[in-house]
UniProtKB/Swiss-Prot annotation:
Annotated UVR domain residues: 196-231
Entry protein name: UvrABC system protein C
Organism name: Streptococcus equi subsp. zooepidemicus (strain H70)
Function per UniProt: The UvrABC repair system catalyzes the recognition and processing of DNA lesions. UvrC both incises the 5' and 3' sides of the lesion. The N-terminal half is responsible for the 3' incision and the C-terminal half is responsible for the 5' incision.
CDD domains, per the entry: GIY-YIG_UvrC_Cho
Length: 594
């Protein structure tokens, strides 16, 4: 068991779901389901196993998991993932049988059937169910509640089920289509979970039978109510309409965004895509950018439908994706988006938890890093990153790692003061000069290594300030990212060259951790500054509202949206005169009306 698996095992949730074991090449070699992901996945790496399982475990290099809402959902998702990926260690289902559905026929006098064959425009289908037994039990319950036609006898003859109170076909006029439409609508609502009315009716009948001392009949109604409660579990990972669709969910935290895409094909959730990256603008804006890039990749075929979270403007998505864009508002479809969002949150949290837990891996990394660079052991490392959007609200940030661990009390933020426009090199020169002129003249502790986020230009700018302007002797290295915003390579030396670092080494992990942390700190600060500037600029030109009062408003209301909802009294409570508060409200009202 490698270190990655050890740490990921500690972060597994106590939730139902599916897990996917992978080999060194990243190929899925086994798919399983679990009522409790934590307990099930851990069991592979504890205790003894039979020969077959030992062989499987010996090939596991990594694993992923998908959280579901119930064990039934996990079972159904497992079926789809196995059929889609055909992992070599999974037992193939005999004859590759499909799974049972309950069908309401399109006949003039509809019947309830169990079928494994789905044909378009041939009736209504509900399911799939994990096995024939489950489907049969649900149908039995429906037969006892809804008096559909049960056999192929002519409707003018009484059948056996009539005597059981389970068929009324012969008593209904041939032309009374409204009755059957109403019955079908009731079953649809029932199977979609809207069963409160039926339960209320059954409960009333149970109480009436009990009152009349018809205890056997009362027990039948009680059993029906119990049966309904048993089958209330929704199967959200399946879709009954056989539609191809992609389902997007996203979650943001600490300057990072995780997007999960569920691929539903022929009504089955067969695969997912997970991507995590730092975001720079508003979350909704960067999500839209991601969606555009996602479908520009020819590997991602555009389905008929795309489901998106309700916070996203569907008209903007429709402008870049030629598909039907849906923001589900209720029911199963909304729950699917919620499930994708939940998995995005879990994945992002796992990333952060892994980073924290893996700090233990850095114990020997500092010394090895010093040896690789040919410098003394870099006990104290200071790292810098710039953040701006086309030169607006430019800022920079510095994080400090001591003995391989973040020293947050030493973190620093910088607002760029002398640079106009988007000039990363000039911004880096300014920040490095401001920081290390203080180190030089105020006797502050100097680092053993400076790391800048960027390539040769940033490194040369920083080194020029350190060596020529300040006359200091502090090594400077650069960390470059790849096109996926992942730590890619370390630059060092004179002339600058790439330092070869194994991707699985402790030194590489330490640098990756530092780069992630300084980037997170920088963009979080940038977002705060940009939000504050936007808030203040919208309040310009209001007489009597200077910087201090704007600061009070920002501290109290946090956003323009909240301020626009504030009352005159709430604004005055901050010590703002009534005339100024009234002018502010008038200004906000006129802005919202335009």
């Amino acid at each position: 068991m490698n270190e990655l698996i050890k740490h990921k095992l500690e972060l597994l949730p106590d939730s139902p779901g599916c897990y996917l074991h992978k080999d060194k090449a990243g190929t899925i070699i086994y798919v399983g389901k679990a009522k409790n992901l934590r307990n099930r996945v851990r069991s592979y790496f504890r205790g003894s196993h039979d020969t077959k399982t030992e062989l499987l475990v010996s090939e596991i290099a990594d694993f992923e998991f998908i959280v579901t809402g119930s064990n039934t959902e996990a079972l159904l998702l497992e079926i789809n993932l196995i059929q889609e990926n055909m992992p070599k260690y999974n037992i193939k289902l005999k004859d590759d049988k499909s799974y049972p559905f309950i069908k309401i026929t399109n006949e003039p006098f509809p019947r309830l059937l169990i079928t494994r064959q789905i044909k378009k425009n041939d009736g209504l289908y509900f399911g799939p169910y994990p096995d024939a037994y489950t489907a049969t039990e649900v149908k039995k319950l429906l037969d006892r509640i809804f008096p559909f036609k049960k056999c192929k006898n002519p409707v003018n003859k009484v059948c056996f089920y009539y005597h059981l109170g389970q068929c009324q076909a012969h008593t209904i006029c041939h032309t009374d289509k409204a009755y059957w439409d109403s019955l079908v609508a009731d079953v649809k609502q029932f199977l979609n979970g809207k069963d409160d009315k039926i339960i209320d009716d059954l409960r009333s009948k149970m109480l009436e039978a009990s009152h009349n001392q018809e205890f056997e009949r009362a027990a039948e109604y009680r059993d029906l109510i119990s049966g309904i409660a048993t089958m209330r579990t929704k199967q959200r990972v399946m879709s009954k309409d056989l539609q191809d669709r992609d389902i997007f969910g996203y979650f943001v935290d600490k300057g990072w965004m995780c997007v999960q895409v569920f691929f539903v094909r022929q009504g089955k959730l067969i695969q997912r895509d997970v991507n995590m990256f730092p975001y720079y603008n508003e979350a909704e804006e960067d999500f839209l950018t991601y969606v555009g890039q996602f479908y520009s990749d020819q590997r991602h075929l555009i389905p008929k439908e795309v489901f998106i979270p309700e916070t996203i403007d569907e008209t903007l998505v429709a402008a870049i994706v030629p598909a039907r864009i849906v923001k589900p508002q209720r029911g199963e479809k909304k729950q699917l988006v919620a499930l994708a969002t939940k998995n995005a949150r879990v994945s992002l949290q796992q990333k952060f938890d892994l980073l924290e837990k893996d700090l233990r891996k850095t114990s020997g990394a500092i010394e090895h890093l010093g040896q690789l660079l040919g410098i003394e052991k870099p006990v104290r490392i200071e790292a810098f990153d710039n953040s701006n959007i086309q030169g607006t609200s430019p800022v920079a940030a510095m994080v400090v790692f001591v003995d391989g661990k973040p020293s947050k009390k030493d973190y620093r933020k910088f607002k760029i003061k002398t640079v106009i426009g988007p000039d990363d090199y000039a911004s880096m020169r300014e920040v490095i000069y401001r920081r290390y002129s203080r180190v030089k003249h105020e006797g502050l502790q100097a680092p053993d290594l400076i790391i800048v986020d960027g390539g040769q230009g940033q490194v040369k700018a920083a080194r020029d300030v350190i060596e020529h302007q300040l006359g200091l002797s502090i090594p400077v290295a650069g960390l470059q990212k790849n096109d996926k915003h992942q730590t890619h390579e370390l630059l060092f030396g004179n002339p600058l060259a790439v330092v070869e670092l194994p991707r699985n080494s402790e030194e590489f992990f330490l640098l990756h951790r530092i780069q992630d942390e300084v980037h997170r700190f920088a963009i979080t600060f940038h977002r705060q500054v940009r939000s504050k500037n936007a808030f203040s600029s919208k309040l310009d030109h209001i007489a009597g509202l200077g910087p201090k009062r704007k600061q009070l408003l920002l501290k109290r209301f946090k956003s323009m949206a909240a301020l626009e909802q504030a009352s005159l009294e709430e604004i005055q409570q901050l010590g703002i005169p009534k005339t100024v508060a009234e002018a502010l409200i008038d200004h906000l009202t006129s802005k919202s009306d335009t």
